[in-house]
Amino acid sequence: MRNLAALLPALFLLGSSLLPAGTALAQPLHGISMHGTPELPADFRHFPYVNPDVKKGGRISYGVVGTFDSLNPFVLKGMRTTARGVWDPEFGNLLYESLMLRSSDEPFSLYGLLAETVEWDDERSFIQFNINPRAKWSDGKPVTPDDVIFTFSLLKEKGRPPFNSRLDGVAKMEKVGDRGVRFTFNDKANRETPLILASSTPILPKHAIDPEKFEQAGLGPVVGSGPYRIKTLRPGERIIWERNPDYWGKDIPGKVGFDNYDEISVTYFLQVTTMFEAFKKGDIDIYPEGDAINGTSDTSHWGQAYNFPAVHRGDIVKDVFQPRLPTGMFGLVFNTRRATFADEKVREGLSYALDFEWLNRNILGGSFKRTQSYWQNSPLGAYGNAADERELALLGDAAKTMPAELLAGTYAMPTTDGTGADRKVLKLAVDKLKEAGYSIKNGKMSDANGRQLAFEIMTQNPAQERIALAYQRSLNLIGVAMGIRSVDDGQYQARSNSFDYDMIIRSLPSSLSPGMEQLNRWNSLSRDAQGSFNYAGVANPDIDRMIEALLQARSTEDFQAAVRAYDRLLVAGHYIIPLYYIGAQWVARWKYIDRPDMTPISGNQKQTWWDARVQ
């Protein structure tokens, strides 16, 4: 026995040496973080921004503008016309769930959901998810590693971007024991890859999905692991979700204080105006103002439209939330796939022509601030932060072509006198267009062959049209012809997917932990991938390098330098004419819908609100 005891340490070391590199000392973890460690301990009971004592029950009615004809947002056909709630960062992932949950009060930390624990090494050469033994589908069957493997394989073959590229960085995907599934990474992976697999991919039921019909994106019966199931479905009009009384995950820490309604309905409207009228009548319970994605932010509406009896009686509450996020970018996007916008000088000149001060004063209510960079109002932003040696080294020769003001952190869009005809600023626009070979001939901005500089902007609602009309007014002053094409929601989504536009108005939100989503927005490989978010059609090797740098950064200092350098490159490219940011989230609600007091980093979390009528 003494000899056996003496041999045990050696046997352990021998066994460890036979394991894959980096796995010998891997320990099951309750959570992981992109940088550092998760803030919450292994025995945490709930997220800090929820009410753990809320009584579940009642109902809520949401309203959205648009339509739906699909329950599958993971293929191109259903990408923008899937019913809300299926896979939904705003209303919650009611049907499908991910392996891990992201905390809304940390830059990028994940905690267990379908995966009870997770294992990885310091090099992040692999990640292993250990499926929660309690996890089950709505039909009672258990969630298994086979479902995970099936999901990633199916999405690689038939999914849309970015789901179809999730396995690009994976060398091997394998089942480990009864509950484990391990992903071993190749040299295409980066340090964020394991977190994206964990938090940004839905796990689908192998037994309930026919791969041959997956791309049809229809409205057939669905099986999910989430807290709700479909009660009523009226395509294009309304979907009603009801609580699954047998939901497996209601007591795990990451779900405490969530999913508080017995019933969730989502009603679809053709226009924002009709949705607001429905809110006034109590047909929907919440009305979020300031939708930058659709260009409907309007301080005058927030300040003046709430003059009706329900407000006077105190039945409606107007909340203002202060998220601690970068401003992001909302603006007019040049499609550089078009020859008209291939020259950076053309884009710069056309950017100067927008009179933001006139637009803000006369159209937007006068309360907005001009966006100057993509990560403005954060330590990651180029605006207000000079490039240091670390950042300059990353930029390399690209820094030599940047304006000195951009490197100094003082670069900003020109400020006009607000008259709508500031000659000084318009001259800047004309001079820059001259550098690109244009000049004004017979009142028209024309190239050397006499062709007028002309393009079209595509809009999807009246608010965007107002912005476009203001821009058109300014361009007319310098002889540039801009047409406005207003299309319905279906056309807008289809043409956006195929990049069939000259210019559109879009929003690109930013976080404190930018990562792989940037590949789908700005990387060269996404330029021609239909359905990607590379609306500007950018293919720039320096931008590709900087995305790779931020993805591979190990220290906070390296990460910050990479994102700032990236921000400067995007600003220098003049791919988007920046508009404005609000700096707050405005949400009106009927007072019978209540919410937690705390606002996390990411802002309001509607998934944690509740029906006060049942308390």
UniProtKB/Swiss-Prot annotation:
Q: Where is the signal peptide?
A: 1-26
Q: Name one GO molecular function term.
A: peptide transmembrane transporter activity
The record ties this protein, via SUPFAM superfamilies, to: Periplasmic binding protein-like II
Main localization (coarse): periplasm
In the record, biological process GO terms are: microcin transport; peptide transport; protein transport
* Phenotype of null mutants: The deletion mutant is hypersensitive to ampicillin, in a manner only partly dependent on the beta-lactamase AmpC. Deletion of the gene leads to the accumulation of peptidoglycan fragments in the extracellular milieu. The mutant displays cell swelling and lysis as well as a severe growth defect.
Supply the Pfam families for this chain: SBP_bac_5
**GO CC term, one of those recorded:** ATP-binding cassette (ABC) transporter complex
Extract the InterPro entries matched here.
Peptide/Ni-bd (IPR030678), SBP_5 (IPR039424), SBP_5_dom (IPR000914)
Keywords attached to this entry: Peptide transport, Periplasm, Protein transport, Signal, Transport
Q: Does the keyword Secreted apply?
A: no
Q: Which Gene3D superfamilies match?
A: Dipeptide-binding Protein, Domain 3, Periplasmic binding protein-like II
* Record has Hydrolase as a keyword: no
Q: Where in the cell is it found?
A: Periplasm
According to the record's subunit comment, the protein's assembly and interactions are:
The complex is composed of one ATP-binding protein (YejF), two transmembrane proteins (YejB and YejE) and a solute-binding protein (YepA).
**What does the sequence similarity comment in the record state about its family?**
Belongs to the bacterial solute-binding protein 5 family.
The entry's function note states: Part of the ABC transporter complex YejBEF-YepA involved in the uptake of muropeptides, the breakdown products of cell wall peptidoglycan. The import of muropeptides into the cell enables peptidoglycan recycling, which is vital for cell wall integrity in this bacterium. Probably binds muropeptides.
- Something else known: YepA is located separately from the rest of the transporter in the genome.
Q: What is this protein called?
A: Peptidoglycan-binding protein YepA
